[in-house]
Curated annotation (Swiss-Prot):
Entry coiled-coil feature ranges: none
UniProt subunit comment: Heterodimer. Interacts with hdm.
GO CC annotation terms, alphabetical: nucleotide-excision repair factor 1 complex; protein-containing complex
GO annotation (BP), single: DNA recombination
Protein name: DNA repair endonuclease XPF
Chief place where the protein resides: nucleus
Organism: Drosophila melanogaster
Example of a GO MF term: protein heterodimerization activity
Function: Implicated in recombination events during meiosis, mostly in meiotic exchange. May directly resolve Holliday junctions within recombination intermediates leading to DNA exchange. Also required for the repair of mismatches within meiotic heteroduplex DNA and for nucleotide excision repair.
Region called Disordered, residue ranges: 1-27, 451-485, 674-693
Sequence similarity: Belongs to the XPF family.
Subcellular location: Nucleus
Annotated Polar residues bias: 458-469
Amino acid sequence: MADSCAENAAKGTENERPKEVEASADTVPQVEEGVEEYLKRKNMVLLDYEKQMFLDLVEADGLLVCAKGLSYDRVVISILKAYSDSGNLVLVINSSDWEEQYYKSKIEPKYVHEVASTATERERVYLEGGLQFISTRILVVDLLKQRIPIELISGIIVLRAHTIIESCQEAFALRLFRQKNKTGFVKAFSSSPEAFTIGYSHVERTMRNLFVKHLYIWPRFHESVRTVLQPWKIQSIEMHVPISQNITSIQSHILEIMNFLVQEIKRINRTVDMEAVTVENCVTKSFHKILQAQLDCIWHQLNSQTKLIVADLKILRSLMISTMYHDAVSAYAFMKRYRSTEYALSNSGWTLLDAAEQIFKLSRQRVFNGQQEFEPEPCPKWQTLTDLLTKEIPGDMRRSRRSEQQPKVLILCQDARTCHQLKQYLTQGGPRFLLQQALQHEVPVGKLSDNYAKESQTRSAPPKNVSSNKELRREEVSGSQPPLAGMDELAQLLSESETEGQHFEESYMLTMTQPVEVGPAAIDIKPDPDVSIFETIPELEQFDVTAALASVPHQPYICLQTFKTEREGSMALEHMLEQLQPHYVVMYNMNVTAIRQLEVFEARRRLPPADRMKVYFLIHARTVEEQAYLTSLRREKAAFEFIIDTKSKMVIPKYQDGKTDEAFLLLKTYDDEPTDENAKSRQAGGQAPQATKETPKVIVDMREFRSDLPCLIHKRGLEVLPLTITIGDYILTPDICVERKSISDLIGSLNSGRLYNQCVQMQRHYAKPILLIEFDQNKPFHLQGKFMLSQQTSMANADIVQKLQLLTLHFPKLRLIWSPSPYATAQLFEELKLGKPEPDPQTAAALGSDEPTAGEQLHFNSGIYDFLLRLPGVHTRNIHGLLRKGGSLRQLLLRSQKELEELLQSQESAKLLYDILHVAHLPEKDEVTGSTALLAASKQFGAGSHNRFRMAAAASRRGRR
């Protein structure tokens, strides 16, 4: 099935395969012998198409885009081994944790260096050479501070290159590297062709950010790939499992409601592009993420009905997935959540449709019979799986004359929940497992049906080692399992619908407790699918497959495994195949990547047809499951066609690799015009040319390198100086200090009072403090909540605005800047620095510390300054006169109201200050008038209350200046 689907996807595009592969094919025979000897010496076993990938990237830097499952990881390992030498310094960036651990395990430890925690230690490690897996944020700071010898870097390897955008830290590091190193290599890898179809000119922009000129395209239908995999084709058997009438009807009704909502959202929003909103996309794509990205910029302009429909489409899709993949009891419990009165009043109205009523009715019928007795229907694939394990596979072993061997079966599932479901079914039987699910989900069982009771009575005592202690402990842990990084959309949906208090394992090893005969008598065996004939192997808790197999040397092995795991990612399947060497693989769910991994694994083994593993595909024909699989193939094929077409039309400048200074001429430079004849003619006669202007500098706090703004500032030609500062985030000039806040950070800082303290420090040390409120460029330039369906109301937004108003009242010198995106912020910083002096890093680092800066004279006690500023009648325009002439706090308390009026130059301010110091004034409830608004501002920002002022005033009588 895998080959046929891939071959069908390749029709019409075989003539459009990458030209660089064809062009380099003639050069392969000339170096073939040398390459084979080199790979053998380095102990690198590669398939023919992997060798070609390796040769292409060694010959010229470039971006390699391959199909999922073709495993470019061996090519990466080969390149890492080729540069494994203490005389080379190779950096690997943008790798996930499991990728880093996997690659490190394949390289000699003496060439791999761990990243040190201190800057001094990192400088020493850099000079030792070898391979470095380093965080991009640390790398950027070290490059800016010149802790790493940039000119000595041999090259950089970039993984997951489809995520490299102009403003990301990886692009920043590559730009810093290429500006000072013109000889090092850049080799990038990606296995996500669909990502390059999003946005305008994504392929060209990614290559420009990577500083590469060559694009290598390797789809599954590439001629070299087909030539390698076709001779070792896996034995695939496609088994169409029929679904029950109830599931078919539920699926039809859900699709009917989704179609109605799609038409409704298009009718309401005729002026908005809703091309991506189709029933097919709602079912098979990451619909909610795509639609959210499309509507984010106008989300605040949409009416409430549209927002409810978008949320309901996601819910309906979850119901569809739950019906297809979960057991009947879990699906019914999930459906019940959306039949409550509270939800009926908060959705778009789909629960009132006749189709919705049928969905709830049919879901209940899957659990209870006509007499309302508990009789849940089993999952359609359960019986087929049991037949495979007890009849088909033993019979095939007998027919192939491998009776003396114990079969090893690998069952692949989509997610950990399905894996746990199958483990419970195989070890406990269907009736017992479904009854446990009913009790767990609080489904009222009531009375058991006669048929179900008889099936349950066939159960004997619970089998030994049904589940290990570790599994029991994990199931008792509260809190649902978070979605894995990199998990595909189906697994995310399944994890979203998990009940709270559950945590599922990703691998189980089982063995048969009732061995099935493989002789002639096996034909008459009719095993009871509801009686457990399997038990778990506890040794797999330590992820030791070898020990698990050794513990049961004469029994069949059955391994349950997810397509990818949190610990090893997509490498988990390849690792399991190498350790287990299965005879049979059962694809309980469909996955394109896993199918190709099986093909590549079989091509590496090069076994005769009789010894190759058999792969059984369990699939519901003409259902959403089959449609999702075929759509994923079609999307990948269309993505590769788009990339191939883009490459044929792409114009790549010769300087794009950054090895000449032409690549950086587009960056803003602040040097004078070149001293050519035209430039000299424009100068006044006899005048000497002006001195070269200094590149503008911006001091950036180290914590700000988590954002995109430092990268964009550098791209505009400003020099970025990373520094640990305690006041502000960006220092533009000696007088301008900027505190940057995103919307979510702004709300949190206003509520906690942290922003108030930050403004106090900025106003104390800088003449022009600035609060920068920066919006996400992909979100509307409008105050709203963080999430797509925000619970923030206009009242909550008004509360934020009121707090900002109080902040500006309390700090008159504070300026607010509203920026729609980091790009606009970078341009604004450049304009603010025009004609201004440069900031001093030493002065900026010393401000806010306990020790005064060089030449700074502390005129006033900062504690007294802050205390007086909080008193009514005292503000920034009169506090300095009060501090100079008021003497001490004790003398201030002894002054009359007339004397205070002379100090403050205001009768009203003097009265307010005198009353707060001498009169037992307690404000009435809800009374905030006149200048006492400043007191309210102090309360808003956690600065204290009137009682605290009275206590402080009493204490100040005993204080000294």
